[in-house]
Amino acid sequence: MKIAYTGLDLPEGKVKYNDAILTDLEAKFKPDKVSPFYFELLPDGYEAAEGIAIAKDSVLDLLIFDMDKIEVRLSVAEDESEKAVLTKCYAHLETEQPVCDLEMDEAEREFVNGFGLLSFKPTMVFDDASVTPDAVCEAVMSKADVMFFYTAGKTEVRAWFVEKNADAVTCAGKIHTDLARGFIKAEIISHESLMTAHNFKDAGSQGLTQLVGKDFPVPEKTVLEIRFNV
């Protein structure tokens, strides 16, 4: 995930997310390999970013950019529905809030997404310029409605990045396309429950795991194994 930042004391470039769940799983399984999540911090790199972290005293510059863009579009817009959405966004920006926080219906969101307002991207405003990279990652992920799920075993422990409420077959496809293509069931368990068992098999024998179908929305902090056949 690429996160643009302004006015914050953050390092530039790829940064490892220090994931307490991954640390727990590593300690339990002692795998050959650990694959953490890395996010990328881009100073003022709004166009390329998937999310934005910005200091409170810098946010007006971002919002004014969007307001100027709306003003130009309104000066030539003829469609009344387009004008209504743009005017709604402009009024919200005048309250010094990013467009991502504005309540919109699906059609409005689709239009605004295509229009390219920067603050429509998941935007977090921070009072403290010395915020940590991990805190930025967590806050922007929460605003963006994305999450991690995990796979764990002796070979590898890994964090996987997906949209919140991603279904089981989508998570399987993240791991490998063959797992999605031959998906049968996913066996899932919360991180907390897995930590009370010896391993995944032991957790299953204790009734701590759940077998779910491909359409099941996978909760946050879930560890899973995919049953498949290709």
Name what the model sees in each region.
Residues 1-10, 76-230:
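C-terminal-of-GTPase-core extension/linker across diverse P-loop GTPases
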Residues 21-22, 45-47, 57-64, 75, ...:
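Conserved nucleotide-binding/hydrolysis micro-motifs of P-loop NTPases
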Residues 1-58, 62:
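Conserved G1/Walker A P-loop phosphate-binding module
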